[in-house]
Amino acid sequence: QYEGHAAPPEEILKSSPFVWFKDALDGYDYLVEQGYDEIVVAGLSLGGDFALKLSLNRDVKGIVTMCAPMGGKTEGAIYEGFLEYARNFKKYEGKNQETIDNEMDHFKPTETLKELSEALDTIKDQVDEVFDPILVIQVENDNMIDPQSANYIYDHVDSDDKDIKWYSQSGHVITIDKEKEQVFEDIYQFLESLD
């Protein structure tokens, strides 16, 4: 997992998208060191963007993006989503509302989100350099990103082997939502199609 994730929200602000991408590269390199030579990279949300970028830096057999942002309403939605995540995390920690409000008044994720926005712009500009087989997965009613990001990825990758799948009953975190079993089956079928 990326540095600062699944931790108090202040921890994520001590990191950056550049560190997270290095975490993805390190994960790939670890698999190679373990003897794996046919690696498919998959990622949810920002992880999907990193899967695309990783394919430009390492030899991959295929790519799966799930609800990966490419711009549009993404920056503001990520900011609001991150504030909501921070509030919920603080509630989960058992803090009272007054403490949460006080901590949130001092919680300013703008620099990290600015770096994230710049990283997304760079990845968007390089999508046309992706030529590996790809499965693009997107929910129709995504509350975090612009669902048209999926069409952008699909339309701009330079892969001859590409597919896009849409899901109408799930939210942004599709891997734990109503259609997760169908998503897993679609990914399995994609993996089986790679020779």
Where do the model's predicted regions map?
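Catalytic nucleophile-loop/oxyanion-hole region of alpha/beta-hydrolase
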Residues: 7-36
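Active-site nucleophile loop of the alpha/beta-hydrolase fold
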Residues: 64-75
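Active-site nucleophile elbow and catalytic-triad environment of alpha/beta-hydrolase enzymes
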Residues: 109-126
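Short beta-strand/loop motif that positions the catalytic acidic residue
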Residues: 130, 136-138, 142
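Short alpha-helix in the alpha/beta-hydrolase fold that links the catalytic acid
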Residues: 132, 146-155
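Catalytic histidine neighborhood in serine/cysteine hydrolases
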Residues: 155-173
